[in-house]
From Swiss-Prot:
It comes from Methanosarcina acetivorans (strain ATCC 35395 / DSM 2834 / JCM 12185 / C2A). This is Thiamine-phosphate synthase. It comes from the Archaea. The keyword Metal-binding applies. The gene is thiE. Belongs to the thiamine-phosphate synthase family. Its EC number is 2.5.1.3. CDD domains: TMP_TenI. Keywords: Magnesium, Metal-binding, Thiamine biosynthesis, Transferase.
């Protein structure tokens, strides 16, 4: 049985939000000017519907404390995912996790978290995207679309045309990641991305709310104009 059938068991509100996502916030305390909690608050206030807590420099206790506050900020307004750390996601009852190709297999993550939780998987090509969908991923993060310095092991950018190839191959949402900013985000959406991540462009700015809102406006304008 295709594990995608487990998707309808997810909370209706969260699955509804997953289908409506536009800009996708990934936190980075190392790059942030104002701090992770401030970034999340401003992005969600601007209309961001999905937040991934990505933290590599804090203790487990510190992460749980911070994740608990992020969950409170997101509330009913945004999906709250934890990057990699299933233990932290379980501790705070996050809406799900985002994992990579070398992390825990989706099937095991589903067993630990339960079928109602959302799982996103990083993929780099059509083959990995198809496998992710077969194994029950709720969405894929495709990249790196452009060269990026945010993630050291991201490799060379695969280009926005790769988004269309993956989008045509699977039915679950495709989130574009890697090196995306306001100068290059338009072809990302035009090639079919449901959403995209722009870490540096947002958390390094002086006004996270303004930058988030601008990205949301760009995405919605392209989608509403039929340019996808």
């Amino acid at each position: 049985m295709n594990q995608k059938n487990s998707n309808p068991k997810n909370p209706p509100r969260k699955i509804s939000l997953l289908k409506q996502i536009d800009f996708y916030l990934v936190t980075d305390s190392g790059l942030s000017k104002k701090g992770t909690l401030s970034d999340v608050r401003e992005a969600v206030d601007a209309g961001c519907k999905i937040v991934q807590y990505r933290e590599k420099n804090k203790s487990t206790k510190e992460m749980i404390d911070e994740a608990s506050e992020i969950k409170r900020i997101c509330g009913d307004r945004a999906i709250f995912l934890v990057n990699d750390r299933i233990d932290v996601a379980l501790a705070v009852d996050a809406d799900g996790v985002h994992i990579g190709q070398d992390d825990m297999p989706i099937e095991i993550a589903k067993k630990l978290l339960g079928p109602e939780k959302i799982i996103g998987l990083t993929v780099h090509n059509v083959e990995e995207a198809l496998e992710a969908e077969r194994n029950g991923a709720d969405y894929v993060g495709l990249g790196s679309i452009f060269d990026t310095s945010t993630k050291k092991d991201a490799g060379k950018g695969i280009g926005p045309a790769s988004i269309k190839e993956v989008k045509n191959a699977i039915k679950i949402p495709v989130v574009a990641i890697g090196g995306i900013n306001r100068e290059n985000c338009i072809p990302v959406v035009e090639n079919g991305a449901d959403s995209f991540v722009a870490i540096s462009a947002v958390v390094c700015s002086d006004d996270v709310k303004r930058e988030t809102r601008k990205f949301i406006e760009i995405i919605r304008e392209i989608k509403n104009s039929g340019r996808q």
